């Protein structure tokens, strides 16, 4: 009958080629799953379906895997290349019939007894048509909803309407030799394999499609019926002298304001639309480390995505990537400012839930929101929220807002019934469409309220935006985190279950800083960010093209030989190709003279490009500081260089969210020094580290590194000088005076970086001084100059230019 099956597959292949578009997950099966396409493969599918086999055939052709239609030859015997757990349902009954897989598997293991060298790869393959999670109340749309083993008539409609949304998901191969060597008879081993396969297919479906959607009334009952919400209703009714019914209606309105209303059909439409937009706007979207997240999902974790926030495009890009990586589309926390017609309704149906900027004083709203969030966690929906609370206007990570993280930890404490992992996500662009409006806001212009016309205007202006980058960071298992930070947290909570734990706030603060460090740990370096860093460090923001290309090559060599982390991504292109690609973005100016090509910043773009430089500033903070130290001292012994780096590192770590501990940073600095010597960015003379010879080609790259850290050091010097002058000063007044003087320095010395006098950056630095005990604090909370801050100021002043030092004396 094999020939008849093959004939049928051939006959239907013509219409199916037009109807079916296959998405293979993952695409790099050799690296992620360890599948070797040179070894015999048997594919294990859930349902014996001709259309599923056709989709599998299309996928294997694109991945270079053996064809599922060709039998596997073993010792002169033929084995089918596909095994199936179930037959399709019949038209008249809902009963699912089992295939003869038990006999096939038993025969396979019997062959192992006859051929000891035999080792087949059994690869489970899950095939999905559409990704509708389903509802408890059925409707007409359920006719085409993908289900386990549908009958042939339903499968016809499924392929007809959902053929373009086919997903072929491969899992790690099972070694038939390993299975055959297990204890037990061939029949027992075969039954074990079948049982495990059934469980695996169920979990794989949950990982891709997610849990069943809640009906609205079920949502109301779950949230409004929670003890905390009922208590909040009673308290508010008592305080406002209204009936419980009135406050209950108010709480119900809060649920409607907050809750998502997910519609898989709209997500599919959005996928098609976004694919066209990405193809028009971006040269490519580079995604790294998605395998880490798939592994978490496969192990049953509740996944919470915490990305950095650069642009409104983040909402779309991350969800799009998650969808195409074969993961459940998350419910997304969005600011209430985005809940305007018609965008709010569209976002809500794509999984967005809305939150107010502040919950302060509104205990009822807080209770409703917290219960809704915990409901999402407990039902198994993945969630995405932005720890910064808003978009970064400078390109740096903002200090984290801890409210959502605190609610997440509180949900875990109350008892989420599966492991919870936070996944940091780094998102980077070579062009952010809002940068011009960010600069206006930094100059004091009021932020424009989001509207449909604003969105329409932005879409109309879409053009070449270069590349987009999305790197998944190192996940944080929250139970393990709490076990490390608060070993007795379970016992403490059991003793006082209704009270907020005293350890919660410090634990949340530690978690928040860890999250931000892990986001930056997964940073993506781009041609745009490298060009911006070099040109902004150059005098008059101009460089010869060959100098720019050489500097970029030097920095790429540095990052490859001494990588900032294993999770950060570095371009594979060389400096010349990166400069050529960056010029196509039309942000740089090119001019010619008799000596060659000069590349400079357009006057209108000079400030805007600080945004892209700031995306990667943390990767070059330590190389820049090393260069500044060696340059200022005109040579220094290695231990002294490391000592000076160690003195300033806690401040850089706090400001730039560098993930390394102090010890790790010192070890990394030592490695950097060796690498910089190897590639010519430093010169070793006996025990002294010196700048490269001024005549060497590497000197300019070294000098630019020194310049890249200067604005940070100048800002440090300004704050410390004001503190020295005042001796004792309030934190608010110190921040205000520091900002005013930084603005003056920027005006007098042509510093075009908005973050040079940004209040968040200055506030973070002053907090870091206090937390690291580099300044004193009086009992009244006043900040005080100290011997330690005096020594720190002296070290910093040695590293900055004399003209800036002279200007500081005028304070």
UniProtKB/Swiss-Prot annotation:
Catalysed reaction equations from the record: sn-glycerol 3-phosphate + an acyl-CoA = a 1-acyl-sn-glycero-3-phosphate + CoA
Matches recorded under CDD domains: LPLAT_DHAPAT-like (cd07993)
Record keyword Ribonucleoprotein present: no
Signal peptide from the UniProt entry: none
Entries under Pfam families matching the protein: Acyltransferase, GPAT_C
One GO term of the biological process aspect: fatty acid metabolic process
Segments carrying motif HXXXXD motif: 308-313
Keywords: Acyltransferase, Cell inner membrane, Cell membrane, Lipid biosynthesis, Lipid metabolism, Membrane, Phospholipid biosynthesis, Phospholipid metabolism, Transferase
Domain of life: Bacteria
InterPro entries found in the cross-reference section: GPAT/DHAPAT (IPR022284), GPAT/DHAPAT_C (IPR045520), GPAT/DHAPAT_LPLAT (IPR041728), GPAT_PlsB (IPR028354), Plipid/glycerol_acylTrfase (IPR002123)
Compartment list: Cell inner membrane
Protein EC: 2.3.1.15
Primary location class: membrane
Cellular component GO terms held in the UniProt record: plasma membrane
Gene Ontology molecular function terms on file: glycerol-3-phosphate O-acyltransferase activity
Pathway membership: Phospholipid metabolism; CDP-diacylglycerol biosynthesis; CDP-diacylglycerol from sn-glycerol 3-phosphate: step 1/3
HAMAP family attached to this UniProt entry: Glyc3P_acyltrans
Family under the similarity heading: Belongs to the GPAT/DAPAT family.
Entry text on domains: The HXXXXD motif is essential for acyltransferase activity and may constitute the binding site for the phosphate moiety of the glycerol-3-phosphate.
Protein name in UniProt: Glycerol-3-phosphate acyltransferase
Organism in which the protein naturally occurs: Pseudoalteromonas atlantica (strain T6c / ATCC BAA-1087)
Taxonomic classification: Bacteria, Pseudomonadati, Pseudomonadota, Gammaproteobacteria, Alteromonadales
């Amino acid at each position: 009958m094999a020939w008849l099956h093959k004939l049928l597959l051939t006959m239907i292949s013509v219409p199916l080629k037009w109807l079916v578009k296959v998405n293979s997950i993952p695409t790099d099966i050799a690296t992620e799953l360890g599948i070797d396409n040179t070894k015999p493969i048997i594919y294990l599918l859930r349902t014996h379906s001709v259309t599923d086999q056709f989709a599998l055939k299309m996928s294997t052709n694109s991945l270079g895997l053996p064809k599922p239609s060709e039998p596997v030859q073993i010792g002169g015997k033929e084995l089918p290349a596909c095994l199936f757990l179930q037959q399709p349902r019949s038209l008249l009954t809902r009963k699912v019939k089992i295939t003869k897989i038990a006999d096939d598997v038993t025969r396979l293991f019997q062959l192992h007894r006859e051929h000891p060298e035999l080792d087949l790869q059994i690869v489970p393959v899950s095939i999905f048509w559409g990704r509708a999670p389903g509802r408890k109340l059925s409707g007409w749309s359920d006719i085409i909803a993908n289900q386990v083993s549908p009958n042939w008539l339903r499968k016809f409609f499924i392929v007809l309407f959902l053929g373009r949304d086919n997903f072929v998901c491969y899992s790690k191969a099972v070694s038939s030799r390993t299975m055959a060597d297990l204890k037990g008879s061939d029949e027992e081993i075969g039954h074990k394999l079948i049982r495990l396969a059934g469980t695996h297919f169920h979990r794989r479906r949950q990982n891709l499609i997610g849990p069943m959607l809640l009906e609205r009334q079920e949502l109301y009952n779950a949230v409004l019926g929670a003890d905390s919400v009922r208590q909040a209703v009673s308290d508010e009714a008592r305080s406002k002298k209204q009936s419980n019914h009135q406050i209950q209606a108010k709480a119900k309105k809060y649920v409607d304001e907050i809750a998502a209303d997910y519609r898989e059909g709209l997500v599919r439409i959005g996928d098609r639309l976004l694919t066209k937009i990405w193809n028009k706007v971006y040269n490519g979207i580079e995604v790294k480390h998605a395998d880490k997240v798939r592994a978490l999902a496969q192990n049953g974790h509740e996944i919470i995505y915490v990305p950095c926030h650069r642009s409104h495009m983040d909402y779309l890009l991350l969800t799009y990537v998650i969808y195409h990586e074969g993961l459940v589309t998350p419910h997304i926390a969005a600011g209430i400012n985005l809940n305007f017609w018609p965008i709010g309704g569209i976002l809500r149906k794509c999984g967005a839930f809305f939150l107010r900027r502040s919950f302060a004083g509104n205990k009822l709203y807080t209770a409703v929101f917290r219960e809704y969030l915990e409901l999402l966690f407990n039902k198994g929906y993945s969630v995405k929220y932005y720890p910064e609370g808003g978009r970064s206007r400078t390109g740096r990570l903002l200090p984290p807002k801890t409210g959502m993280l605190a609610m997440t930890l509180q949900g875990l404490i109350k008892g989420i019934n599966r492991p919870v992992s936070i996944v940091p996500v780094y998102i980077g662009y070579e062009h952010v469409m809002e940068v011009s409006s960010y600069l206006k806001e930094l100059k004091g212009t009021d932020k424009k309220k989001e509207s449909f016309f604003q969105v329409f205007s932005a879409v109309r202006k879409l053009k070449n935006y270069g590349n987009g980058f999305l790197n998944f960071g190192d996940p944080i298992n929250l139970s393990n985190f709490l076990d490390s930070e608060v070993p007795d947290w379970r016992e403490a909570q059991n003793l006082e279950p209704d009270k907020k734990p005293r350890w919660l706030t410090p634990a949340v603060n530690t978690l928040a800083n860890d999250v931000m460090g892990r986001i930056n740990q997964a940073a993506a370096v781009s041609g745009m960010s490298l060009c911006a860093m070099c040109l902004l460090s150059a005098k008059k923001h101009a460089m010869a093209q060959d100098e720019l290309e050489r500097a970029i090559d030097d920095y790429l060599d540095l990052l490859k030989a001494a990588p900032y982390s294993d999770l950060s991504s570095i371009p594979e292109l060389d400096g010349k190709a990166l400069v050529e690609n960056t010029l196509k973005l039309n942000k740089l100016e090119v001019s010619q003279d008799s000596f060659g090509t000069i590349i400079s910043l357009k006057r209108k773009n000079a400030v805007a490009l600080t945004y892209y430089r700031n995306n990667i500033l943390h990767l070059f903070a330590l190389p820049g500081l090393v260069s500044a130290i060696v340059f200022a001292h005109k040579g220094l012994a290695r231990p002294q260089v490391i000592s000076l780096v160690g003195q300033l590192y806690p401040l850089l770590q706090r400001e730039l969210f560098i993930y390394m501990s102090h010890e790790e940073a010192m070890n990394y600095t030592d490695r950097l020094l060796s690498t910089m010597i190897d590639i010519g960015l430093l010169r070793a003379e006996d025990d002294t580290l010196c700048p490269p010879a001024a005549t060497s080609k590497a000197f300019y790259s070294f000098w630019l590194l020194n310049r890249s850290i200067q604005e940070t050091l100048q800002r440090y010097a300004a704050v410390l000088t004001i503190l020295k002058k005042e001796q004792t000063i309030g934190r608010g007044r110190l921040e205000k005076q520091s900002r005013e003087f930084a603005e003056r320095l920027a005006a007098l010395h042509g510093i075009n970086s908005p973050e040079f006098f940004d209040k968040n950056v200055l506030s973070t630095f002053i907090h870091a001084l206090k937390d690291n005990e580099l300044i004193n604090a009086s009992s009244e909370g006043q900040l005080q100059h100290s011997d330690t801050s005096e020594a720190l100021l002296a070290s910093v002043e040695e590293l900055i230019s004399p003209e800036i030092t002279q200007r500081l004396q005028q304070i």
